[in-house]
């Protein structure tokens, strides 16, 4: 998508009520303001404890501050039909939305869908 709508989650529960010394006020809100000056269509900080109830449907991308903040609810909603990517690196890093699934080795039960989603994302990047 040309101009995706991006949700940026806060770090603390309830965005630490946006108190003066919270990471949301010191770091996240200024970063969002900077992104907006670059015409990046982003919103936040959004509390991570409520976005996955329904609000996630209004966004193309959800940026979390750490792995389980996003992936735990994301997997509950989408199972393994999704990918995740890591931002802030010098290279593109995408990953299927599941772990190594060592218990499935040599059992012919693993799904290849998430891997194909990664490949298709990279091809269209």
Spans of model-derived segments:
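Glycine-rich phosphate/nucleotide-binding loop
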Residues: 31-125
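Glycine-rich phosphate/diphosphate-binding loop of Rossmann-like nucleotide-binding domains
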Residues: 1-45
């Amino acid at each position: 998508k040309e101009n995706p709508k991006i949700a940026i989650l806060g770090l603390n529960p309830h965005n630490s009520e946006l108190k003066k010394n919270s990471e949301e006020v010191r770091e996240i809100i200024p970063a969002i303001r900077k992104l907006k000056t670059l015409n990046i269509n982003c919103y936040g900080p959004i509390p991570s404890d409520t976005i996955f109830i329904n609000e996630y449907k209004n966004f193309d991308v959800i940026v979390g501050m750490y792995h389980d903040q996003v992936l735990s609810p994301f997997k509950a909603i989408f199972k393994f039909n999704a990918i995740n990517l890591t931002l802030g690196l010098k290279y593109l890093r995408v990953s299927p939305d599941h772990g190594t699934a060592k218990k499935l080795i040599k059992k012919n039960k693993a799904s290849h869908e998430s891997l194909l989603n990664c490949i298709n994302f990279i091809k269209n990047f």
